[in-house]
From Swiss-Prot:
Keyword Nucleotidyltransferase annotated: yes
Annotated site, Transition state stabilizer, chain positions: 18
Function: Reversibly transfers an adenylyl group from ATP to 4'-phosphopantetheine, yielding dephospho-CoA (dPCoA) and pyrophosphate.
The protein's annotated pathway: Cofactor biosynthesis; coenzyme A biosynthesis; CoA from (R)-pantothenate: step 4/5
Record-listed E.C. numbers: 2.7.7.3
Protein name, per record: Phosphopantetheine adenylyltransferase
Any one Pfam family match given in the protein's UniProt record, by short name: CTP_transf_like
UniProt binding sites for ATP: 10-11, 18, 89-91, 99, 124-130
Gene name as annotated: coaD
One Gene Ontology cellular component annotation held by this UniProt entry: cytoplasm
Membrane-crossing segments per the record: none
Quaternary structure annotation from Swiss-Prot or TrEMBL: Homohexamer.
Family stated for the protein in its record: Belongs to the bacterial CoaD family.
Keywords noted in UniProt: ATP-binding, Coenzyme A biosynthesis, Cytoplasm, Magnesium, Nucleotide-binding, Nucleotidyltransferase, Transferase
Amino acid sequence: MTSIAISSGSFDPITLGHLDIIKRGAKVFDEVYVVVLNNSSKKPFFSVEERLELIREATKDIPNVKVDSHSGLLVEYAKMRNANAILRGLRAVSDFEYEMQITSMNRKLDESIETFFIMTNNQYSFLSSSIVKEVARYGGSVVDLVPPIVERALKEKFKTPLK
């Protein structure tokens, strides 16, 4: 049986923290789908198409990673892909409560899909897409926070020179 995991998020933009979780998940599962979900409570900075392209470029050297988007329930997408796992990263205890609520709802919707949590490496425990955008907006260096393709895309959007 092939083990298939879904790593989902808004990825607006993808960070090295996201990439760390994806790479580690790709070592455990046969296939990992990185899925851009449309979060109705967030106003995206990058379009879905831009985010997909940034993720594809950032994960191009991980052969068992596929990139996609979805507008519905994550559990429905997982069923469509015959996935048996949802992969989630935890940065801090504060993430756990929210993730536990989502996991409980996903289990209620489909008990056959398990959620696996991976603790973020300490070097990324503070990192979020929101922080990255804030630093880039004011011309700060994001070189140690995002893949090079994302750094270039942020500089282009904010019209700031590369540092």
